Amino acid sequence: MSDQQQLPVYKIALGIEYDGSKYYGWQRQNEVRSVQEKLEKALSQVANEPITVFCAGRTDAGVHGTGQVVHFETTAPRKDAAWTLGVNANLPDDIAVRWVKAVPDDFHARFSATARRYRYIIYNHRLRPAVLSKGVTHFYEPLDAERMHRAAQCLLGENDFTSFRAVQCQSRTPWRNVMHINVTRHGPYVVVDIKANAFVHHMVRNIVGSLMEVGAHNQPESWIAELLAAKDRTLAAATAKAEGLYLVAVDYPDRYDLPKPPMGPLFLAD
């Protein structure tokens, strides 16, 4: 057995924040920019060996993350500062490591997760924003956030989300368990906050697209429940844009003792 094979292997978890507006999603792909590719390149430079990361949730093109979690294995012994400050120095400005934690062998960023939480941010104003144009979704018709919240409560619990599932979704089942869904207004911002054990493809954006129709009084409050029961994607509203969506938190069993920083995005109070 070579000396290289005898080196100890370290398993490391990282919290990652990124502005997804300039990336073709999280997942590494040929010939297009991805968050995974940039992160692996920076980690490999610090480790001085090739690094492959596994994430809690693969976000789509244009979607952001403030609470993404990844893990990787390495034979490179490094201090925490190397995996945070050192990696950040090698990352583009729109991706950053928020925290680092050594984890046991049985930890997996995706398969150990018990829930994911997303926030969808709508800038509800007659005029479009400029500074946050890629960080929020603009909707000019006045929205009734309380009406949206009431309509959304039928989605709680375990349900078949076929009506809110992208046609190209590869998940084996449309059933998901929604733990909470809250719609609140913060000045001109309407925030849809949803937590579930997992999500089918485009589930949050499809739910938000239909909730905006309810909030604008284009559909009755009962419409969301009717869509859920119909199990027909063609009956629901168009998919909401990617710009307003953030993966803000991932839950894990307490025994892993992972950090829980403020969820953000930073222009919102927690």
Swiss-Prot record:
Positions with a binding annotation for substrate: 118
Site residues, Interaction with tRNA: 58, 78, 110, 126, 139
Molecular function per GO: RNA binding; tRNA pseudouridine(38-40) synthase activity
Keywords: Isomerase, tRNA processing
EC number of the protein: 5.4.99.12
UniProt enzyme class: isomerase
Superkingdom of this protein's organism: Bacteria
GO BP, sorted A to Z: tRNA pseudouridine synthesis
SUPFAM superfamilies per record: Pseudouridine synthase
Classification via InterPro entries: PsdUridine_synth_cat_dom_sf (IPR020103), PsdUridine_synth_TruA (IPR001406), PsdUridine_synth_TruA_a/b_dom (IPR020097), PsdUridine_synth_TruA_C (IPR020095), TruA/RsuA/RluB/E/F_N (IPR020094)
Region RNA binding, residue ranges: 107-111
Pfam name, any one: PseudoU_synth_1
Region (Interaction with tRNA), start-end ranges: 168-172
Residues annotated as the enzyme's active site: 60 (nucleophile)
Reactions catalysed according to its record: uridine(38/39/40) in tRNA = pseudouridine(38/39/40) in tRNA
Function: Formation of pseudouridine at positions 38, 39 and 40 in the anticodon stem and loop of transfer RNAs.
Subunit and partners: Homodimer.
HAMAP family: TruA
Family affiliation: Belongs to the tRNA pseudouridine synthase TruA family.
Protein name: tRNA pseudouridine synthase A
